[in-house]
């Protein structure tokens, strides 16, 4: 089992990670990863700067969700080669809780229900756990409620959400909005959204997109993993990358997403067959 903070003394102070911001927030080089013995990521490279929004698109099975799980440190996803540097720190040496405390947030494609645990308790526990790891004073009930009410106002969300069990009985749109609200409270530096638009009708999609746009800032970067370009109509990315067979094979601006919508992934895959060199992977 990994230590939460292995390595040199700097790595034992997560607050240093959050303060030591460099222009390139996330740098992935030649990343290989496998799941249950099967290689999924096959030499992926990518650079993300603070303030940028990057969309990761690709067909089913290309490795999009695997990338998100590898970055967040989920068990069962084995990195076999390559490096991931986050704010100058080797991200792969950190346990999942240390990555979260350092500002890495993953919004799941299928948010889980936690019956009997209301959102207020869950969010306060999560926030204070991160503050404790960073050596910061935990928030008491009054301080936390003040913070949460401020976030509810900014995000234009009803306070009814606070009294409901986490995702229990929520619609698909409510679950996704709840994750965006969690992100607003936890204030990550790197937010990874794994198919946040999956299963949403147009009204729910617009609400989720509004939340994401509200949280865009020069200090925060987004990786938006998506299969379709419709989310990008409402959250306009700085860069779009096409992931195929475990590699980024093409990069561009939003016009690349429109090209994919018109011609599909087949043309991209045909021009970059498996085993060929990666093209345009680093933005």
Segments (PLM) and residue ranges:
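The feature captures the beta-strand-to-loop junction immediately N-terminal to the Walker
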Residues: 57-59
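ABC-family P-loop ATPase nucleotide-binding domains
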Residues: 112-189
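Conserved structural motif at the start of ABC-family nucleotide-binding domains
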Residues: 26-28, 41
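Conserved beta-strand-loop-alpha-helix hinge in the C-terminal portion
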Residues: 239, 243, 247-270
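ABC ATPase NBD Q-loop/coupling interface
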Residues: 83-99, 167
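Walker B catalytic motif
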Residues: 192-196, 203
